[in-house]
């Protein structure tokens, strides 16, 4: 079976800016690490293992919704649509939707977007494209912003109906204010144009605010190596700068995974889960390559948040984003739901 096409739509190489993002985050208060640092190829392997654990309810619930409601969700997507998947790390979940579209004989174009070229190649290789006649597939190598620019500006694409998939609770990784801005940006790029009345966003949100359930989900097997792998990746990126001649001399970089441990917390005030790295033994000097930054004992270096949305917060998110809620798909007892959104 021939390899599916991949289009490189990158406006710049993210790897080139990550070292600057690392330094900026570590010199801020509170200290942070950029989320993209955690999604190297090795990091994604650890995350995929973690997300399959029994206690990690978000993935399981989302799969159940797509498996049971796939036909209804597929009916909401217009014929001739361009489907832009902004979270295509693996196709196990969205596969149910694609199979439903094929069964309904809807001619659509599915584009899997990923910032990692190897991960994108793996994703596309897993697609049994020979089983599909109506759904056609391709990959897009780039960031969210690259994907939105592409769907808005590509002549043969921009006037077709668009369906943007934002599954995997991706919107929960943003602060509430930034989530509204990001969702509005998607709407402005993908829900405008000649077919705006036929275009939509399919968004998943989690409403669970039970601290024990949430923290148990984010401490299940696989999450610790996922978190610590980012330190190895960060050091590799920083050392590459030296090899490329950006620095004139070899500098020290103290990012040893064994000196850190993973911390999982529920923030009651903000309604979010927080994931951080914290020194294991005492103060850690990160070395001259990182401006001799010192992380104090018990000081948190936050790298991820997962916001949960109750009904009031969800309503405000959609209002601030300039979108209207259409259909909603969930199952009894589920905290996760998938929302159809249209331009207001």
UniProtKB/Swiss-Prot annotation:
UniProt keyword annotations, A-Z: Alkaloid metabolism, Methyltransferase, S-adenosyl-L-methionine, Transferase
Pathways involved: Alkaloid biosynthesis; ergot alkaloid biosynthesis
UniProt key word Methyltransferase: yes
A molecular function (GO) term: methyltransferase activity
GO biological process terms on file: indole alkaloid biosynthetic process; methylation
Family stated for the protein in its record: Belongs to the methyltransferase superfamily.
Protein name per the record: 4-dimethylallyltryptophan N-methyltransferase easF
Organism placement in taxonomy: Eukaryota, Fungi, Dikarya, Ascomycota, Pezizomycotina
Gene designation: easF
């Amino acid at each position: 079976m021939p390899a599916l096409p991949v289009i490189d739509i990158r406006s710049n190489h993210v790897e080139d800016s990550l070292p600057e993002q690392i330094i900026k985050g570590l010199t801020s208060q509170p200290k942070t690490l950029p989320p993209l640092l955690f999604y190297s190829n090795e990091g994604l392997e650890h995350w995929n293992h973690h997300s399959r654990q029994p206690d990690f309810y978000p993935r399981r619930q989302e799969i159940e919704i797509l498996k049971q409601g796939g036909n209804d969700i597929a009916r909401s997507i217009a014929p001739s649509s361009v489907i832009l998947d902004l979270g295509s790390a693996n196709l196990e979940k969205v596969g149910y939707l694609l199979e439903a579209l094929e069964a309904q004989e809807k001619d659509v174009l599915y584009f899997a977007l990923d910032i990692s070229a190897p991960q994108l190649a793996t994703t596309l290789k897993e697609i049994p494209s020979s089983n599909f006649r109506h759904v056609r597939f391709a990959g897009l190598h780039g960031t969210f912003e690259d994907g939105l620019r592409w769907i808005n500006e590509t002549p043969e694409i921009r006037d077709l109906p668009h369906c943007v998939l934002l599954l995997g609770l991706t919107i929960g990784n943003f602060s509430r204010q930034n989530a509204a801005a990001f969702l509005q940006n998607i709407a402005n790029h993908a829900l405008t144009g000649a077919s705006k009345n036929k275009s939509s966003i399919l968004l998943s949100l989690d409403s669970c605010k039970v601290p024990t359930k949430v923290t148990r989900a984010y401490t299940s097997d696989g999450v610790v190596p996922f978190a610590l792998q980012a330190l190895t990746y960060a050091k590799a990126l920083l050392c590459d700068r030296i090899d490329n001649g950006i620095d004139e001399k070899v500098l020290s970089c103290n990012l040893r995974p064994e000196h850190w441990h993973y911390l999982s917390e529920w923030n009651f005030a903000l309604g979010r889960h927080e994931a951080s790295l914290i020194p294991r033994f005492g103060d850690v000097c990160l070395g001259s390559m990182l401006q001799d930054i010192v992380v104090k004992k018990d000081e948190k270096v936050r790298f991820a948040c997962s916001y949960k949305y109750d009904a009031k917060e969800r309503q405000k998110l959609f209002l601030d984003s300039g979108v209207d809620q259409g259909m909603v798909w969930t199952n009894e007892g589920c905290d996760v739901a998938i929302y159809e959104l249209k331009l207001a």
